[in-house]
Swiss-Prot record:
Belongs to the BsaP family. It comes from the Bacteria. Probably contains an unusual Fe-S cluster. One of its GO terms (molecular function) is iron-sulfur cluster binding. This is Biotin synthase auxiliary protein. Required for the activity of the biotin synthase BioB. Keywords: Biotin biosynthesis, Iron, Iron-sulfur, Metal-binding. GO terms for biological process: biotin biosynthetic process.
Length: 80
């Protein structure tokens, strides 16, 4: 399923909420609580770790990586 996600938030070596490489994280610190609840949009690109431009809207969010393109929460709902 993670392989089906767009590049900025799909399988990558960086955490999309903290920007830290997965192997550098402490156990249990990989996802903030608000992200676990689905209330926080991704802030970092999973592929390159760059900070993304994130726009939060009343109906969702849009995140754009300067190198890997854009992803929208509407696209995520379609994959559920």
């Amino acid at each position: 399923m993670v392989q089906d996600l767009p590049t900025p938030i799909g399988a990558g070596i960086y955490n999309i909420y903290t920007g830290v490489k997965h192997r550098d994280e402490l156990a249990g610190a990989s996802m903030p609580t608000v992200a676990q609840l689905g209330l926080e949009p991704p802030r970092f690109c999973a592929e390159c770790g760059r900070r993304m431009v994130v726009q939060v809207r009343p109906d969702g969010w849009r995140a754009k990586c300067s190198r890997h393109g854009q992803v929208d929460s509407v696209d995520m709902e379609a994959k559920r």
